[in-house]
A protein has these predicted regions:
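Active-site microenvironment for binding and transforming phosphate-containing groups
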Residues: 1-139
Length: 139
């Protein structure tokens, strides 16, 4: 997975055939569409959802949106929108919980790629960025 400003999500499940995982790359459009929850629901077929992790991405401090987009997020994920920003981490958490991931088993990195200079950020650096690499390995 090569997320830019998008939200990287890893979902883990277990079942009779052994453990399985999914990686999800969710931009704001995918987040509103419920891509994290849809992936979790698909992974849960015949399995039990065990955990999920939300990796570094643009944080609620920096994801400024216009009023129309703020309203769309608030309608889809109550409590996710501030006066001028949206908390995509909260959106991911709510989507995963709704799909059946136990709330206590969802880990959010809490690292904002826009405000933390150790990460690339399209918004912060006006498009002059690289990519982050994320991968999962089943052992």
């Amino acid at each position: 997975m090569l997320p830019g400003a998008s939200i990287p999500v890893v979902i883990v499940a277990d079942g009779d055939e052994g453990p399985a995982f999914a990686t999800v790359h969710a931009g704001w459009r995918g987040m509103i569409a419920g891509v994290a929850g849809m992936a979790a629901a698909e992974l849960a077929k015949g399995r039990r959802l065990v955990a999920a992790a939300v990796g570094p991405s643009i944080g609620p401090c920096c994801f400024a949106v216009d009023e129309e987009l703020r309203r769309r997020f608030e309608a889809r994920f109550p409590g996710s929108a501030g006066a001028e920003t949206v908390d995509l981490w909260r959106c991911a958490r709510l989507d995963l919980e709704a799909a059946g991931v136990p709330p206590g088993a969802i880990s959010v990195a809490g690292r904002c790629t826009a405000s933390d200079g150790r990460f690339f950020s399209h918004r912060r650096d006006a498009g002059a960025t690289g990519r982050h690499l994320g991968f999962g390995v089943r052992i």
